[in-house]
Amino acid sequence: DAIHAAGFETGVVHAAGSFALLHNDGARLDGVRAGSAILGRCRRTRDDRLRTVGCGEVPLAEVRWLPKGHTVGTDKPVVLKKTTRVAVLPVGYQNGFGVTRPRETSFWALWSLWRRNKKRTVRIGDQRARVIGSVGATETMLNVTNLKCSAGDLATFDIDPLFARGFTREFR
C-alpha cells in the first residue's frame, strides 16, 4: 500500500507459491504460483482434498529366485539374508524414479527422507512389492517372494512428473 501511496504502479503483485496458497492467506497478495499444488506435491495438510498426480507404468523385465547370500545392487549392494524371489523393474533414477525435489535440509527432514526410501514400494496389480536396496540408474530390484507375478506384468509406481524421463505422457 505504501508503494501505491507514493505513486508507483506495481501491476499484479505476487510473491507466493503453492505452500502460501494453502497455508498463508496474507502472503497471497494479487496472485500465487501454484505449480506443485497442481501436481499435489507440496507440503500440505491431510484434509486439503488434493490428489497427488503422476505415476509410471512399466512391465516387469524379469522375475527369478536368488539364493541366500546373493548380492543385489551396485551403489549400495544388499546381501540377501534368505532365498528371495526378485523382479527387475526396468526403471531407475535416470527415469525419475525415486527422485524428489529438495525440501528441507534439517536432520529430521533428511531422516524422514531416509525412512521413506527404506519403505519405497511398487504396485503390481493389487499387491505391493518393496524395493530391495537403493534405486539403480536404469533398473530397480523388487522383492516379490510372496507375490503372484511374472515377467511382463504391469508395475505401477509413484513418480514426480517434473522428473519423469523415458515415458509416454498420458493424462487420464
Segment roles from a protein language model:
Residues 2-172:
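Active-site anion/phosphate-binding pocket segments in diverse small-molecule metabolic enzymes
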